[in-house]
Amino acid sequence: MTSKKPTPMMKQWHQCKEQAGESLLLFRMGDFYEAFYDDAVLLSQNLDINLTQRQGIPMSGIPVSTVNGYIDRLVSKGFKVAIAEQIEEAQNNKGKSEPLARELQRFVTPGTLLSSSLLPEKANNYIVSIYRVGSLFGFSCLDFSTGAFLLNEYDNMKDLIDEICRLAPTEILSCDKFYKKHFEIVEQIQQHLKLTLSTYSDWAFEHQFATQKLSSHFNVSSLDGFGLKGLVPAINAAGALLSYLQDKLLLPVEHISVPKTHGNQKHLLIDTASQVNLELLTPIHDPQGKSSLLHVMERTCTPMGGRLLRNTLVNPFYDQKEILLRQDAVEFLLNRSELRKNLRSFLSQVRDLERLTTKITTALAGPKDIGMLRDSLNASMHICEILSPLPLPEFFHGKFTLGLGLASLLELLSKALFGELPLRISDGNIFSDDHHPDLKRLRYTRENSKEWLWQYQDAIRTQTGVKKLKVCYSQVLGYYIEVSSDLAPLLPKDFIRRQSRLHAERFTTEKLQEFQDDMLNVSDKLQTLETQLFKDLCAQILEQRDAILSLSQVIADTDYILSLADLAAEYGYCRPIVDTSDSLSITGGMHPVAQTLLDRGTFIPNDIKMHSARTRMILITGPNMAGKSTYIRQIALLIIMAQMGSFIPARSAHIGMIDKIFTRIGAGDNLSKGMSTFMVEMAETANILHNATDRSLIVLDEVGRGTSTYDGLAIAQSVVEYLLFTEGKKAKTLFATHYKELTDLENHCPHVENFHAGVRENGGHPVFLYEILKGHSQKSFGIHVAKLAGFPLCVISRAQQILRQLEGPETTSKQTQEKVQQLTLF
């Protein structure tokens, strides 16, 4: 930095920069936000804008009118942005030697977006706070754009990481002490998520401070009433998060909801590996592609409905009543196609009620936002009017009276506002003329001043009988009425004399003075009036804030159910029986994603029938590409859909609720952690063995393949035996394997059944049937797969020769067998 004495304006900048810390500071100067020193260099490099100098100080700037787009670009690159505003109008600073007053007013970080193109419409944007006390990890997350505030505690790192990955935050907050001691947590999370790390003071995570912060914000003397008694680490994380937003980032927090415990006792748990392996939200090999379960199920019309669908997909229910309530509601709409069409029409007109309410609460809403709220309430009212008279299933009971209760607010907004509204209050033309008596007069004055003067002149000529009276204007007097001196006595007594001339007299009236005042300040008066009216209207809206948020949840629920009903109607899904039994029976089941990617009717359906008293484990053998992996994933996906309350692609199904789903399906090398593919495989399998229960579903694909044949086989068989015979671990297990030796377990254990992916040979070449059939496979057809993969023909020929030798009775070399089998078990 320069050694010259800073100017008064740069002193302001230094004060703001000290407060901004590591954030990139945008400093308002007239019509631009300027950056100085290192911030200017960063701004120039990352936004491709000019870097200049003033008095040796590097500087660059962006226009106020387009600042939001530039901020989005900075945040998308991982920057935190601090914004210093002018808090004094230029006209109020005339004659003063000091610069305009400025202060740091807000920060923008990835986890605190509100008005941004980066904010995902149908996904939450969470910031997460984590802390540890003793053996417990405290966890709190908040969606600043909706105000949703959740917290929980975990007794192990794995569950904490899984929950954070499930929520997919864009920013994580903790203190230096935690990061130094537990940075492996962040490293593991960063393998799955792109996020920003933020640090806050250690003292903010202390229990006394955190408790006081939360109690003060929610105006309570104790947090016990929120169900938080004894949750010390979670309270510490939540209090620090609230303080970080309010005290560090200077953000409004009035809209933040009462914190809720984010428990998993009534949800089907899906760990991070399974969420990825099953491609619930994002395809593994094509992140922008269409082969995720979310993409297939996504039929929602509203942002709130989309977020609810996404959240339920990774947190299905483990509560029979909740599942049945939604199934009944889906069936109700499924049988009423015209009703679905009408609902879809109105739902598509509903904007993001949650985020609109947040913008109004935080005083960041503009006229267009209020217009979107009005239109959304109008569409929601139609939805309530359509559904409330119908014989609705229990899920919908009592929901649609909420919308009708907002009729008076909708009427107010409809009468108060113009149809088309501007982005900014300063653009004007927000309120209709009838909303306030001064609006019509001021607008008329502004737009029809000359006509008004002619009409007024005619009116007072008629009133006084003085036909030669004139209305004139001068820089000194402003507007005045002039008559010849001999006619002045004819004017009414309420005419106010302004000036006497040699042969004329000049007057004014209260009405003309009012017109003059209006004309001289009409634009300012209009803006001031509409600004105040806008604030008043927002205050009236916020009186109904809770009702609007309740309506938002009703709309989300309706949209969610409609989405599932539309999906079921489009593909002819069946309603599964979901209960507390131990059954897993699906007839004619199809992979919900693969089914949509193939021509209709070409996907081969398959069955499954499991019950702990009979079959707890199915071993599936057969060649690669024959459908084993698709089948085992399919079963897991159908269970997830069923426990969301959705219908599923099958002819019939009876599913006893599953409490946890675990998958061990492939793995990429984790070189940054020094973990090989095999180590990842073993770590994931260990997690399954430790955490599975009798009511879990385990999907295993080729466990043990990453080491020597005998080591792998030994591990695989040991895993199988552990899951079959260990009390509390007797989960339903689907195990796809090339180890034919495992299939012998069927002869020794009544709870194991062998199945295989069907193949028919035609002229020595396999034809994959994509059917899962009883019994084990006789051949792997690995060389055929290598041929399909494009191996040179000489390599294929040599492999066939070696295979014939190995399959012959003369081959007894254990070493040769082990090496070659390892190669063919891909």
Curated annotation (Swiss-Prot):
Record SUPFAM superfamilies:
DNA repair protein MutS, domain I (SSF55271), DNA repair protein MutS, domain II (SSF53150), DNA repair protein MutS, domain III (SSF48334), P-loop containing nucleoside triphosphate hydrolases (SSF52540)
Listed GO MF terms: ATP binding; ATP-dependent DNA damage sensor activity; damaged DNA binding; mismatched DNA binding
* Keyword annotations of the record: ATP-binding, DNA damage, DNA repair, DNA-binding, Nucleotide-binding
Q: Which Gene Ontology cellular-component terms appear in the entry?
A: cytosol
User: Some GO term, biological process aspect, for this entry: which one?
Assistant: mismatch repair
InterPro entries named in the record:
DNA_mismatch_repair_MutS, DNA_mismatch_repair_MutS-lik_N, DNA_mismatch_repair_MutS/MSH, DNA_mismatch_repair_MutS_C, DNA_mismatch_repair_MutS_clamp, DNA_mismatch_repair_MutS_core, DNA_mismatch_repair_MutS_N, DNA_mismatch_repair_MutS_sf
- What does the sequence similarity comment in the record state about its family? Belongs to the DNA mismatch repair MutS family.
Known function = This protein is involved in the repair of mismatches in DNA. It is possible that it carries out the mismatch recognition step. This protein has a weak ATPase activity.
- What's the protein called, per UniProt? DNA mismatch repair protein MutS
Tell me the lineage of the source organism.
Bacteria, Pseudomonadati, Chlamydiota, Chlamydiia, Chlamydiales
